[in-house]
């Protein structure tokens, strides 16, 4: 039995591109993101590709939003064939001894804690008789410290370990999990990085953009697709799109 695929952060960038690739491959997609005009656009595009798709507004920084979204998903679908945990935020881009505590906490909540909360609330819909593939979107920042990105680095490192734990504990429940780093992609996150004047490496990222080194979200999504739907990739793997 094939169920729906849940993609978080699906209103734009990599998330929207992955959601569209999955829907175009013939699967219903649940697109999750904060309420916005972009989410509405994504919903219309997905409906044209697969009429059983759905968009749900949800802020992964808000536990009540996560609970409400999980309830809607459970009321409309019986099984999730896959989850793509793509939602994330780069900020705060600040020295870790100067950053506001609330901003740092929100980054950890959105990038890491919300992943566990949402997945846990959907536990009755994943694995068991039918396989579920969980993919988390990783980053090079999970492997090395980037100045002024402390919250993002910590969250992404934690997300990699979360994925490994899910791979270990989910295997007996017919769940496989893996993480994929997309490389440097032309998204709104990159726009925010290039605008961060106090970021020590800002000129590096401006150069990536000006010299055309950024990947297009659609190209990255095509590489992600076979892993998201379980046709490629092993349980517990961590991959980089640039090596595929």
PLM segments and residue spans:
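Conserved glycine-rich cofactor-binding loop
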Residues: 11-12
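Active-site helix of classical SDR
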Residues: 119, 155
């Amino acid at each position: 039995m094939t169920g729906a695929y849940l993609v978080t952060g699906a209103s734009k960038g990599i998330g929207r591109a992955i959601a569209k690739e999955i829907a175009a491959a013939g699967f219903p997609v649940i697109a999750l993101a904060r309420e916005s005009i972009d989410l509405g656009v994504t919903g219309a595009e997905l409906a044209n590709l697969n009429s059983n798709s759905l968009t749900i507004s949800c802020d992964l920084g808000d536990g009540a939003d996560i609970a409400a979204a999980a309830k809607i998903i459970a009321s409309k679908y019986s099984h999730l064939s896959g989850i793509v945990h793509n939602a994330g935020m780069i900020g705060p881009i600040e020295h870790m001894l100067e950053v506001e505590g609330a901003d740092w906490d929100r980054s950890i909540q959105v990038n890491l804690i919300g992943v566990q909360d949402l997945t846990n609330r959907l536990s009755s819909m994943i694995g068991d008789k039918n396989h579920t593939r969980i993919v988390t979107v990783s980053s090079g920042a999970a492997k090395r410290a980037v100045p002024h990105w402390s919250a993002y680095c910590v969250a992404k490192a934690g997300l990699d370990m979360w994925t490994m734990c899910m791979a270990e504990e989910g295997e007996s429940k017919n769940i496989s999990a893996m993480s994929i780093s997309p490389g440097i992609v032309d998204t709104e996150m990159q726009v925010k990085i290039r605008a961060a004047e106090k970021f020590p490496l800002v000129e590096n990222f401006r150069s990536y953009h000006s010299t055309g080194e950024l990947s297009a979200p659609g190209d990255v999504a095509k590489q992600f697709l076979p892993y998201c739907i379980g046709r490629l990739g092993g349980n517990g793997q961590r991959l980089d799109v640039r090596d595929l």
